[in-house]
Amino acid sequence: MAEAKTVTVRQTGSPIRREKDQRATLVGLGLNRVGRVSTLQDNPSTRGMIRKVQHLLEIVE
């Protein structure tokens, strides 16, 4: 069985003074502190969440 594609993201920005939905999106991605790294399945819903808070994230290669 083929291994599922994944994407790894690191939080680079603080959720302080951000809209409530952006903070909730970070929590949904498993991020709640600057510098935290999370590996997620690469699917359209995850990509949409990443795009919503892309200014607070960095894609880790």
Curated annotation (Swiss-Prot):
GO terms for biological process: translation. Disulfide bonds: none annotated. GO terms for cellular component: large ribosomal subunit. The keyword Flavoprotein does not apply. GO terms for molecular function: structural constituent of ribosome. It comes from the Bacteria. The gene is rpmD. Belongs to the universal ribosomal protein uL30 family. Part of the 50S ribosomal subunit. It holds the Pfam family Ribosomal_L30. It comes from Caulobacter vibrioides (strain NA1000 / CB15N) (Caulobacter crescentus). Keywords: Ribonucleoprotein, Ribosomal protein. CDD domains: Ribosomal_L30. This is Large ribosomal subunit protein uL30.
